[in-house]
UniProtKB/Swiss-Prot annotation:
Coiled coil: none annotated. The keyword Ribosomal protein does not apply. Signal peptide: none annotated. It holds the Pfam family SmpB. This is SsrA-binding protein.
Length: 149
């Protein structure tokens, strides 16, 4: 698995409830840009429309060697999932406070571009502070153990 981009803020800002691997419909120049790791997914999110899932704000830069028919960097892209997975995700999103965000863009073993999407629920500010405290404590503990050994 060749990881192209990861949205690291997802783990900090949200509690991950479940994850799904989805295919994505891309143009040729978008695939070439992905292979060059020219993608940004900081503000990306997934919406359901007409029993299909669409990813918004996934910025794939224009391929510099492409012809005049280059793609739009922020175009809306369709995600490919099984019908029962789409129904499950759409049912979960109807519940309050649950969002779907792309967490990872990668190429699988067969060379196909995939997006790992996550069903998430937003963390409260005190949860984020708690996570920071726990992370700092682990670092300090590791430093102390390293120094004492």
């Amino acid at each position: 698995m060749d990881i192209v981009a990861e949205n690291r803020k997802v783990r900090f800002n949200y509690t991950i409830l479940s994850e799904y691997d989805a295919g994505i419909v891309l143009l040729g120049s978008e695939v070439k840009s992905l292979r060059q790791h020219k993608v940004s997914m900081g503000d990306a999110y997934v919406l359901e429309s007409g029993m299909e899932l669409w990813v918004h704000n996934l910025h794939i830069s224009e391929y510099n060697r492409s012809s005049y028919k280059n793609h739009s960097p922020l175009r809306v892209r369709k995600l490919l999932l099984r019908r029962r997975e789409i129904n499950k995700i759409a049912g979960s999103v109807k519940a309050s406070g649950i969002t779907v965000v792309p967490r990872l863009v990668y190429f699988n073993e067969r060379g196909l571009a995939k997006v790992r999407i996550a069903l998430v629920k937003g963390k409260k500010l005190y949860d984020k502070r708690e996570a920071i405290k726990a992370r700092e404590w682990e670092r300090e503990k590791g430093r102390t153990m390293k120094r004492d050994i």
